[in-house]
Every structure is written in structure tokens, then in C-alpha cells.
Amino acid sequence: MKKIKCALIGPGNIGTDLLYKLRRSPVLEPVWMVGVDPASDGLARAREFGLKTTDKGVDGLLPHVVGDEIRIAFDATSAYVHRDNSDKLTALGVKMIDLTPAAIGPYCVPPVNLDAHLDSAQTNVNMVTCGGQATIPMVYAVSRVQPVAYGEIVATVSSRSVGPGTRKNIDEFTRTTSGAIEQVGGARKGKAIIVINPAEPPLIMRDTIHCLTDGPPDVDAITASVHAMVKEVQRYVPGYTLKNGPVFDGNRVSVFMEVEGLGDYLPKYAGNLDIMTAAAAATAERFAEQMLAATAATA
């Protein structure tokens, strides 16, 4: 089957984990890995897998975009450089999947709003953050039943799973995740907190979600909605587990999640990598299917 060719920008933890997932995709073919450090482990792994690489940043990729038929690019660098990367590549007709908190394109959380993006001509979609991908489906599971006045999430991740790019973007992480809790999750007001835990051995990703509903919560409907949404996320992140809840206390609905990774690049405790990269891969696969269908229709 024909595949859509892709480039990955940023060979850190997220970019390298994503590479493993794209190599298993039935519709995506990673062909380039872009970095800035010649000694990067991610670039070395990409070369081992047969990808072309450059340590000259996106400028090193641009001359090859058309010739190598790159249609989709994943940016796993940082919010500070994403806009420049996106402008250069979208000008060449490349669709950007943004894994930074830059959020210059609309937020995408696959089980909540991916279908809406397929119907639009967006050239750039933003995957929010790892904390957003883990928690916003739960906020939405409550808000689709009844209005949510306030949604608060706490994402706790292992220090070892958090690379330098994410550490530079902590403020952007909280702003972007809070915004997406409102715009995608459906809460009127959102707040996000990230805890980077230095414990050894590293702890698995844990997420706590609190929602304050308008009026007494509909216990049965919210419980059913939460369980249904967990199954939706598990379609692309099998290690997404409801540990407790939903717990009801007055107007507060609390959900407690755990996210175990597949162990592709970092061990299974790094579920924060997995939920981000799996969501990005799932999103890109839907775009690729759309591209392939359009090509077949005009053939």
C-alpha cells in the first residue's frame, strides 16, 4: 500500500519515540529526521533505521521536501522555534503536526475533535501537551453530559522522561493546556498543573482531573461517559487506565488516571511520551488516509 512520506523535526525524547510508532504505521513512512546536534542519539537512531538526517535544522530539510515527497511534518522541538519551522514548511504544502506548546494552529485531541479538523483545510494542528492529551478527554467526558464551570488537571510525570525542550516550555505547557481544557474540554475556566517528580525508580505518569459542574452532577450519565471515553483513548494508547473514579463530592467530579507507555524509546513509566506521540501518530494517520483517498479519486 502506498504511504505518505513524513519528516520529524526534533530528535529528542518525543521525536525519537514518535519515530518508533511511525515505523509501524500502515499509511505513514518516516523518511527524514531533523536536528541541530550532530551527536544527537535521536539522529543516530534515525540513521540506523535508514532515514535521511540533517543537523542543520529545518533549513537543512527544505531543499529535499519536494523531491522526497514529504507531505506531513511533525515538530517536536520547542514553542520558541515552531512558528518559523511551520511557516517554512507549510509554504511548501506540508501539513504540520505540532507537538510543542506553541499552539499556532487549532488544538487537536483525537477522540474529542479530530473529525472536525479533517473537514477543514488546516495546515497546522497542535497536539496540546502530554498532560492535555491525558486529561482533556476526561474533562470532555463530563462536559458533554452537563456544563462544567471549572476544570483543573494535575499531570505528574517522571523527571527522567522530561527532556530539555519540555523543561524550557513549562510556562507554555500550563498556558496551552489550560486553554485547551476550555476550548476542547468544554470547561468555562481551565487550570493545568504539571509536577515533575525526581523519584527513583521513576514513577509512571499519573493524572488527576477535577471538574465542577453546574448543578448536581448526573452520576450515572457521567460515569458511563467517562468509561466510554477511556475505551476511545485506549484504541491508540492501550496503557491508558482509569485507576479511580469518577468520584462525586457535591458538584465536584474527580477522575484519576494512569498512563503506561509501550516502552518504545523510554521505559513504560514514560506514558507522557506515549500519549503525546500516539495521539500525533493517530492524527497524522487520519490525514494520510484522507490524502491517499484524494489521490486515488483523481487517479
Curated annotation (Swiss-Prot):
Glycosyltransferase in keyword set: no
One Pfam family from the record: AcetDehyd-dimer
Known catalytic reactions: acetaldehyde + NAD(+) + CoA = acetyl-CoA + NADH + H(+)
GO terms classed as biological process: catabolic process
Enzyme class label: oxidoreductase
The EC number(s) this enzyme carries: 1.2.1.10
Molecular-function GO terms, alphabetical: acetaldehyde dehydrogenase (acetylating) activity; NAD binding
Binding-site residues, NAD(+): 161-169, 272
Key word Iron present: no
Keywords: Aromatic hydrocarbons catabolism, NAD, Oxidoreductase
Active site: 130
Family indicated by similarity: Belongs to the acetaldehyde dehydrogenase family.
Protein name: Acetaldehyde dehydrogenase 1
Name of the encoding gene: mhpF
